[in-house]
Amino acid sequence: MKIVRMMGLAVLTASALVLSMTAASAHDPDTAEGQAAARTFMADHIPAERHAVTGTAAGVPCVNGKADIYPCKNVDLLSVLPLSGLGGGNGNDIWGWTDPVSGKEYAIVGRTNGTAFVDLSTPTSPKFLGNLPSNGGSSSWRDMKVYKNHAFIVADFISGHGMQVFDLTRLRTVTTPQTFTADTLYKGFGPAHNIAINEETGFAYAIGSNTCSGGPHIVNIQSPKAPVKAGCVSQDGYTHDTQCVVYRGPDAAYRGKEICFNANEDTLTIVDVTDKARPVQISRKGYSGAQYSHQGWLTDDQRYFLLDDELDESRGTDKRTKTYVWDLAKLSAPVHTGVYNSPATAIDHNQYIKGRYSYQANYQAGLRILDVSGVASAQLSEVGYFDIYPSGNAANFNGAWSNYPYFSSGIVIVNGIEQGLVVVKPTFTTAGR
C-alpha cells in the first residue's frame, strides 16, 4: 500500500486520496491517479524523513537497556552504515546473500535511488561495494529477493522499471565501490510493489504490479538471466505481499503443491499456484480489526501464519503493535485464533520467522523479536529488541522498514528509512533455533 509518511504529523494514505479508484489505477504510474499519489508522497515527505538521530559507534553490547544511543534488550549493536555511505536516498527493503564458495555474507540494501551491496565479512566494519542505480527514477518502494546467486529487484511507481537481475558473484572481485549495471532487465511489467521467490521451485512472484490486476505476476527464473513469464494470479485483485512455498503442512490435500499465502489488503488469501497457467484460489478470509493486510510469514511447520496489518495501529485507539495469529490446519478454512499486542507503540511492517522466533521490523520501535513457541494458543512473547529510532515510539512511519535474519553467523541486518544499514546480533542463547 502507498502510505504517505510524515514525521510527527497526521498520516495520509494514498487509499484515502483515491477512494474511488481501483487498486490497479492507484498503483500504476501510467495513470493520472497513480502519478498524483506518487507526486504527493515524493514532493511532501521524502525530505523530512532524512532527519534522524543516528549513532556511529560499532561493536557496542547492550548493557542496562542501551547500546550507544539505542534502546535494546538482548541484542548487541555491531555497526551502522548510514545512507550517506550507501549512495544516499532513503532506505526501504533489505535482503541477504551468502556466497556458497567463500561463505561471505552480504547485505542487499534497497534505497529510493538504487540498491547497495555491502560486504559483511567484518560485521563491525561493513564495506560498501557499490550501487545498482534505479531503472528510471526514484521510488520509496524497492524490494529484492535472491535465487541462484542472483538478486531480483523491483520498484514501485516507476513505469518502466521492470525486474532488474544482478549476478551477485560479481561482488567477489570488487575492491573499490562501483556503479553497477543489471545483467538482465525483465520487462513483463513496469512497476511492482514487492517480490517473493520460491527458491525450491525457481519461480518469482512480482506483486502489486501494473499487470495481473495487481496480483502475483509469476516469472520462471530457473535460468536467472533469462526470466520468462509463467502466469498471473488475478482472481482476488491487488496483493501487497506473499509467501510462496512447496507445502508440507498439516493439510494432506495440498501437500507437495506450490501454495501462496497472500496479504490482499483486507484478507488472507491462499492460492494453489502449482499450475502457473491455472492458479486456484483455495480460500479468502477476512478478520476482525482489519485495516490493511500487509505481510506475514509461516511458522517452520507451516501450521500457523503470523500476519501484520499496517494500518490498524494508526487508525485504532490502541496504538500498540498487533500481530494476527492464524491456524492453517485446513487451507480451505483458515482460522484467526488471536492477536498478540506488543508493549511498544508502533506500526508493524515486515516480519520473518526463523525457528522459534519472529523477527519484526516495526518502524519507530525498530527490530522486535518474538518467541512464537506458544503460537498454538496464540501466545507470543517478546524476547529481544533493538530500537533504531531512539527519538521515540509512535504509530508513524519512521525507522525500521525491514530486516533479514537468515545468516548462519546469527547477525541480523535492518534497513532504516532514515538510518541506513544497521547490523545487530541477538545475545539470547537460543536465537534463531
Labelled PLM ranges:
Residues 25-433:
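Feature marking well-ordered beta-strand scaffolds used for ligand recognition
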